[in-house]
């Protein structure tokens, strides 16, 4: 057991540079590579792509494909600005400016809509807070009324018990 441990330690120490051992007064942690201590080789079978389809996965349009296939896909999702064709008499820079103006208008419209939504939501929140306050006052009033009725009922029951005894 000790010879095996010593050989494992010597193998792992042999992978450590000698410069770490030259300064004996400084104790540094030594990195041990676990792959050097015990090497495992696991051979996993490689399944062809079609065999996974027979296991129950679908091979419809949601199946994975390589980047060359996805770039040629007809229903490809495009991101970013829509690219318009440049006519012969048009300048590419003027088209870019047109795109920027278009998206700036859309962005400003979206921001205006968000601001309007925030204002309406703020007003609605204030209205709901007022309703909650009114409902809480109504609940406290009903609780007081209920407590008064309970008090009267308990007094009447006590009077009734006193009269019967």
From Swiss-Prot:
Its main location: nucleus. The gene is zip-10. This is Transcription factor zip-10. GO terms for molecular function: core promoter sequence-specific DNA binding. It is found in: Nucleus. Residues 104-150 form a coiled coil. Residues 53-99 are annotated as: Disordered. Transcription factor that regulates the expression of genes in response to changes in temperature. In particular, binds to the promoter region of genes such as asp-17 in response to severe cold to warm temperature transitions to promote gene expression. Promotes stress-induced death, particularly in older animals, following cold shock followed by warming and this may have evolved as a form of kin survival under thermal stress conditions, favoring the survival of younger animals. GO terms for biological process: innate immune response; regulation of gene expression. Residues 53-71 have a biased composition (Low complexity). Disruption phenotype: RNAi-mediated knockdown reduces the lifespan extension phenotype of the mir-60 loss of function mutant. Keywords: Activator, Coiled coil, DNA-binding, Nucleus, Transcription, Transcription regulation.
């Amino acid at each position: 057991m000790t010879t095996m441990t010593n050989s494992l330690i010597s193998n792992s120490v042999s992978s450590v540079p000698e410069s770490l051992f030259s300064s004996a007064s400084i104790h540094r942690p030594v990195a041990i590579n676990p792959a050097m201590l015990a090497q495992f080789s696991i051979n996993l079978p490689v399944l062809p792509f079609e065999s996974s389809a027979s296991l129950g996965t679908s091979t419809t349009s949601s199946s994975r494909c390589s980047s060359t296939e996805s770039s040629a896909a007809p229903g490809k999702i495009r991101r970013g600005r829509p690219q318009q064709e440049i006519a012969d008499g048009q300048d590419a820079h003027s088209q870019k400016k047109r795109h920027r103006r278009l998206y700036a208008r859309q962005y400003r419209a979206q921001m205006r809509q968000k601001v309007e939504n925030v204002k309406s939501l703020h007003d609605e929140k204030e209205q709901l807070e007022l309703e909650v306050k009114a409902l809480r006052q109504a609940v406290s009033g009903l609780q007081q009324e209920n407590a008064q009725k309970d008090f009267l009922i308990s007094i009447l029951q006590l009077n009734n018990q006193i009269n019967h005894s």
